[in-house]
Amino acid sequence: MQRSLGSLAGMATSAFGAGTSAAMRQATSPKTILEYIINFFTCGGVRRKNEAQYQELIDTMADTLKSSMPDRGAPLPENIILDDMDGCRVEFNLPGENNEAEQVIVRVSKGDHSETREIPLVSFEKICRVLLFRYEFSIPQDSVMLTAQGGMNLKGAVLTGANLTAENLCGTDLSDADLGGAVLFMADCDGANFKGANLSGASLGDSNLMNACLEHSIMCGATLDRANLTGANLQYTSLLGCSMVECLCSGANMDHANISGATLIRADMSGATLQSATIMAADMEGAILTRANLRKASFISTNLDGADLAEANLNNTCFKDCTLTDLRTEDARMSTSTQTLFNEFYSENI
């Protein structure tokens, strides 16, 4: 079946104007009754052909951008041409001398016939940057370039040892990605999804991880000094041996996290929840845990010298062989067992 110009124009518009999973599904689904019939009797043959064409568009665009730009941060060309796409020419005209509109004009032509569409410049630029990012770090191109929220789709990407210093990763989906040993110093990861990702040995100092999802991620030996984890989700996260000096974890959810061997000197964990968290041989000198929920958390051989647990929830919290010199516990809620423990073993230090 020969693809119509309108169909190819619509496909290009979906790929480079939206770039989401929903847009891909809509663009590659059968459109006419005939296509639905053929798709049915070929067990999805029409959709498979459309998906292959969609992926070819993306791969060709990535190659074209890479060959026409000196680096990923350079301005996009005003005119981008993809030749021989199913026998057609696909042209993208960005706003400039040849395009006074504020939109990107997509023109698909073959012989004397052509079809045009318009797509938002902001979306087009964002998608092109995703293609270039994937190209630079040797990540295979994916037909889904953006998340439904407009962040980069880098799910499952292999970025071991990658230098992502000061990179803008806001809203990026990096779930199940491998970032072992990667450098994300001062990276902006606001709202990013790192669920199940490997961040062992990664450098995240001074990074912005506000509202990021790090649930079930592995961060053994990572550096998070002065990182902003306000409101982040760190449930079931492994933070073994992490350096989190002066880290801001206010309001973070760290339930069931393993923070053993971590350094949290002067970390601000006010209002955080660490229910059933395991904290063994950690250094939390001067840490701020005011209003934190530490219910059923286990502190073993941990240094809490000068820590502030005022108004914290200490119901059924375990403290064993800990240093609690100058610990503040004003208005903290304690279960009878925890109160007895403090009265019998730590009363002179508080």
Per-region residue spans from a language model:
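Non-Sec secretion/translocation targeting segments of pathogen effectors
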Residues: M1-I37, F41-C43, I350
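N-terminal capping/linker segments that flank leucine-rich repeat
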Residues: L5, G87-N153, S335-I350
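N-terminal leader/targeting signatures
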Residues: A12, Y36-I37, C88, D190, ...
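Compositionally biased, intrinsically disordered low-complexity segments
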Residues: S14, G19, R25, Y36, ...
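Membrane-engaging insertion elements
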Residues: G19-L34, V46-S68
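Short loop/turn hinge sites at secondary-structure boundaries
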Residues: F40-C43, T64, S68, R72, ...
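Short linear elements at protein peripheries
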Residues: N50-Q103
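Tandem repeat scaffolds
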Residues: E136-I350
